[in-house]
Amino acid sequence: MKEILLAENSGFCFGVKQAMEKTEKEIEKKQRNESAGALYTWGPLIHNQTVTDALRAQGVRIAENLDEVTAEDTLIVRSHGEARAFFEEADRRGIHVVDATCPFVKKIHDLVEEAYGKGYRIIILGDAQHPEVRGINGWCENSALVVPTAEAA
């Protein structure tokens, strides 16, 4: 008979757990009528269809464009984070944003912004189309060299 072992550290990472907790708090506010408008996540909160379906069943919508969200709505930024320009545009539109960016990712944003401000060239190892990489690149005005491997750098 085959045995299935569950890894001791399985499940959501810290950043995703935090994003889920913030989303649950926002759902509770909606249920208590403490916030007007709809509740959105910016893209799927996590890459897990079961979780996405469960959130949708609780009234959470997925936004892919800021034009979908009004100033009465709440928009949750997933743990991947977003570029500075995204936050500035949401603020300009008066959209209430709940930033669920993973603290580790936010630290990278801060380091990139600081280094870029000092004139350093930013190099990011990763998939240029991945939301986390796009978000990081957005903290240096999308000027980073994005390469898939250290060898390519």
Task: Please identify what each model-predicted range represents.
Residues 1-153:
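The feature marks the mature, well-folded catalytic cores of soluble enzymes
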